[in-house]
Amino acid sequence: MHLAAGAAALAAVPRTARAQAYPSRLVRIIVPFPAGQASDTVARLVGQSLSERLAQPFVIENRTGAGGNIGTESVVRATPDGHTLLLMGLSNAMNATLYKKLNFNFIREIAPVASIGGAPYVMVVNSSVPAKTVPEFIAYAKANPSKINMGSSGSGSVSHIFGERFKMMTGVNLVHVPYRGGYVPDLLSGQVQVVFGTISSCIQYIRGGMLRALAVTTLTRSDVLPEIPTLAEFVLGYEASQWYGIGAPKDTPAEVIVKLNTEINAVTAHPLIKARLAGLGVDPMSMTSAAFGTFIADEAERWGKVIRTADIKAE
């Protein structure tokens, strides 16, 4: 008994030492999307705080392309020591279904480290659209089938898939118009009439009266737009949320993941960071790495069904 206990204690020493020594050098956080997007801003907020807390630089590296798959694969192939991390989100979980010939399995080859937060999208219409509520919009769309254009940030994008889910649940016929660049200019001009967009991209136009917010996509109202109802108040069961978190290559030491999880949860609980995230429409979401892994798998399955049912193809 004493020998077994002693062996266990000795085995724990390297693991404890490894956690204490981490990070031993610069840490790269790969953001698989362009600089300036909400995911990039979230990564920089968290990275700066981790740099201060752990006394090593956490550097953001934007590695874009293929719907986020290029940056994600670079993390899959990285040395699993905790010094290369991934800023990941809902699109990563969706890509598992959207892309048929990936060179990696996101669910199996990226270890969940820590969740950062979740963010509603907002259903917005051009101010010329006569509908002022979701029920009015549904009635208007059904009276004008195939005459209303729904913009998105690309075929297979989060905004596209959220819109397709709305179409499936309400029976409306909207014409999807994907954009490689921003959809906001054409939404403002009326070339497209409705978009499921990020709050951060739309809020200044909502407050300026150029766009009308009909609903947010989460089950609870947003603190940023508390007067705007949820879609679920009118479309029973509709719930959709963008989310962000940190991942690492599989086989990253468990003690490193635990340390990062603890540190990231502390970062997102800090009042200043919470306020900065709130400005982006992001609500902190804290959970263990294991719980985060279950959450990601559930999201991949849920949105995979929508993608298959609507026969959505990535660009």
Which residues does each predicted region cover?
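An extracytoplasmic/periplasmic, membrane-proximal ligand-sensing/linker region
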Residues: 24-26, 169-170, 254-315
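Hinge/capping helix and adjacent helix->loop/strand transition within the periplasmic-binding protein
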Residues: 77-83, 97-182, 231, 236, ...
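A ligand-binding cleft/hinge motif common to bilobed small-molecule-binding domains
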Residues: 92-101, 165-169, 194-227
